[in-house]
């Protein structure tokens, strides 16, 4: 701020005193010297820019900036998207720094090399563990068989929901069952069995010693063993006369042998209702059992030509024009056929509805 000069007056002398003239002259001389000194100081102060002028300049600059901002607001809306596009373009490719997506080619190459060695090491470790696992596991014989369930069963021909519903006088209703049985029994043709397999003595296990990777021989199960249900004598398997044939087989279990040398037998009856609804069933083979010569099974890698034995049920006298629930069970030592929550362990349930 500007300094203000203080005004000075000649000192007033008290009334009644008298001073000498030389003293008065000296005081006046000093007064004039002080006035000159203060005038010089004021001149020096006036030469320095004042604070008020600086403030005025700053206010002027602020007003100019505000005007520029107001003028730029109209253009900023139109240029906003253009600036964003420029930013995106520079992010995708910056020609000055030669960077794409904020990375140089060298950094990307380094990242690829790191990931390559990382995943290569990971794959090598996994491959090593899998290799060690396969060394410990035999491909020919299961390592753990304690939890293997007793054999389940399945039937042919295939029927939706296990309901055999057909009309004797309408071939189109039962022809699909005949086709299914013919296709299933192709592998049991006598000529094919005689060519691939050997004739084994019945009533005893066919145990084959040797290395576990050695090919095993299989016993013959000819289609002709099924007699009236073979499709050789009656190509319709009894469906044209209302006496259908249904084939049953046990699922394969590696190393399974019926206990105590007793063959597993098959027995069918009415599940619920009048037992007289099924008055006659013929079984083929006549023993209604799976002969011991077809056991044990050594697995698909070595027992290549193995043919599962079958038991055919020929329902020769069944009540007509109503549904008959049928249950067929396996019976033998060590066979389980009463599991409530599994309908196919040791038994199977299906329905016959033969219309005339």
Swiss-Prot record:
Residues 33-43, 51-72 have a biased composition (Acidic residues). The chain crosses the membrane at residues 110-130. Residues 1-109 are nuclear. Expressed in perinatal myocytes (at protein level). Expressed during postnatal development in skeletal muscle and heart. One of its GO terms (biological process) is regulation of DNA-templated transcription. It comes from the Eukaryota. Residues 32-77 are annotated as: Disordered. GO terms for cellular component: chromatin; nuclear envelope; nuclear inner membrane; nucleus; sodium:potassium-exchanging ATPase complex. This is Protein ATP1B4. May act as a transcriptional coregulator during muscle development through its interaction with SNW1. Has lost its ancestral function as a Na,K-ATPase beta-subunit. The gene is Atp1b4. Keywords: Membrane, Nucleus, Signal-anchor, Transcription, Transcription regulation, Transmembrane, Transmembrane helix. Does not associate with known Na,K-ATPase alpha-subunits. Associates with a SMAD7-transcriptional complex. Interacts with SNW1 and TOR1AIP1. It is a single-pass type II membrane protein. Residues 131-356 are perinuclear space. Disulfide bonds: none annotated. It is found in: Nucleus inner membrane. Belongs to the X(+)/potassium ATPases subunit beta family.
């Amino acid at each position: 701020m500007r300094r203000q000069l203080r005004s000075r007056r000649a000192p007033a002398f008290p009334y009644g005193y008298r001073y000498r003239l030389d003293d008065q002259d000296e005081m006046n001389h000093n007064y004039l010297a002080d006035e000159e000194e203060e005038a010089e100081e004021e001149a020096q102060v006036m030469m320095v820019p004042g604070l008020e002028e600086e403030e005025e300049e700053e206010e002027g600059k602020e007003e100019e900036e505000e005007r520029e901002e107001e003028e730029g607001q109209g253009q900023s809306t139109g240029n906003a998207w253009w600036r964003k596009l420029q930013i995106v373009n520079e992010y995708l490719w910056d020609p000055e720094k030669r960077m794409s997506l904020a990375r140089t080619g060298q950094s990307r190459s380094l990242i690829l090399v790191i990931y390559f060695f990382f995943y290569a090491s990971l794959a090598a470790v996994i491959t090593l563990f899998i290799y060690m696992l396969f060394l410990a596991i035999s491909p020919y014989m299961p390592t753990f068989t304690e939890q293997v369930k007793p054999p389940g069963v399945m039937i042919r021909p295939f029927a939706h929901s296990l309901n055999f519903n057909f009309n004797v006088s309408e071939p189109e209703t039962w022809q699909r069952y005949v086709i299914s049985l013919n296709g299933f029994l192709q592998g049991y043709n006598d000529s094919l069995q005689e060519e691939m397999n050997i004739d084994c003595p019945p009533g005893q296990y066919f145990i084959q010693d040797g290395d576990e990777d050695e090919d095993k021989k299989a016993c013959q199960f000819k289609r002709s063993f099924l007699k009236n249900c073979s499709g050789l004598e009656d190509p319709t398997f009894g469906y044209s006369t209302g006496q259908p044939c249904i084939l049953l087989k046990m699922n394969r279990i590696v190393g399974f042998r019926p206990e105590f040398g007793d063959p597993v037998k098959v027995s069918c009856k009415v599940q619920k209702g009048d037992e007289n609804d099924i008055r006659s069933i013929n079984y083929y083979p006549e023993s209604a059992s799976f002969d011991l010569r077809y056991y044990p099974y050594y697995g698909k890698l070595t027992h290549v030509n193995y043919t599962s034995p079958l038991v055919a049920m020929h329902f020769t006298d069944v009540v007509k024009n109503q549904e008959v629930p049928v249950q067929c069970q396996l019976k033998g030592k060590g066979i389980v056929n009463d599991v409530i929550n599994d309908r196919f362990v040791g038994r199977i349930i299906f329905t016959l509805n033969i219309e005339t």
